[in-house]
Amino acid sequence: MAKKSHQENNDNLIAQNKKARHDYFVTDTVEAGLVLTGTEIKSVRAHRVNLKDGFAQVRNGEAWLMNVHISEYDNGTYFNQDPLRNRKLLLHKKEINKLVGALQDKGVTLIPLKMYIKHGYAKVLLGLAKGKHQYDKREAIKRREQNREIERVMKHY
């Protein structure tokens, strides 16, 4: 039996940052592991994650995921952590150095696009992104509307 690709199996998708591609031009992506506590991974498996305001930084040769909200586990008692705490990202040194070089450019940031479970481990897909201006967003909306209209007309022929 053929191995399923990541795109075919969306059962493991935990959270997706839908506004990211609307607000940013995403140029490159990289997959990173997450260092989580026991109660945090239980909340992740329960899909209680919000990536909306999250971003990543490289400090002292280590990558950190900031401002990602992982809700407290209901049965966690005193083992629960702060929902917005900084979480370490697991990347190879070469990948971190590549990101440091890319982040030197003005206006480039690192944002989480998706969080998913892969082989039992929580992973986050990070995107190197540059912010869009308002007129870029309007242009994208116009282009999308034109394509929808063309598809609607072509459907009848």
UniProtKB/Swiss-Prot annotation:
Q: Does the keyword Cytoplasm apply?
A: yes
Subcellular localization(s) per the UniProt record: Cytoplasm
Print the keywords alphabetically. Cytoplasm, RNA-binding
Major place of localization? cytoplasm
Q: Name one GO cellular component term.
A: cytosol
A GO biological process of this protein is: trans-translation
UniProt superkingdom: Bacteria
* Cytoplasm in keyword set: yes
Q: Which GO terms describe its molecular function?
A: RNA binding
Task: Name the family the entry cites.
Answer: Belongs to the SmpB family.
Q: What does this protein do?
A: Required for rescue of stalled ribosomes mediated by trans-translation. Binds to transfer-messenger RNA (tmRNA), required for stable association of tmRNA with ribosomes. tmRNA and SmpB together mimic tRNA shape, replacing the anticodon stem-loop with SmpB. tmRNA is encoded by the ssrA gene; the 2 termini fold to resemble tRNA(Ala) and it encodes a 'tag peptide', a short internal open reading frame. During trans-translation Ala-aminoacylated tmRNA acts like a tRNA, entering the A-site of stalled ribosomes, displacing the stalled mRNA.
- NCBIfam families listed in its UniProt record: PRK05422.1, smpB
Q: What is the official name of this protein in its record?
A: SsrA-binding protein
* Biological source species: Limosilactobacillus reuteri (strain DSM 20016)
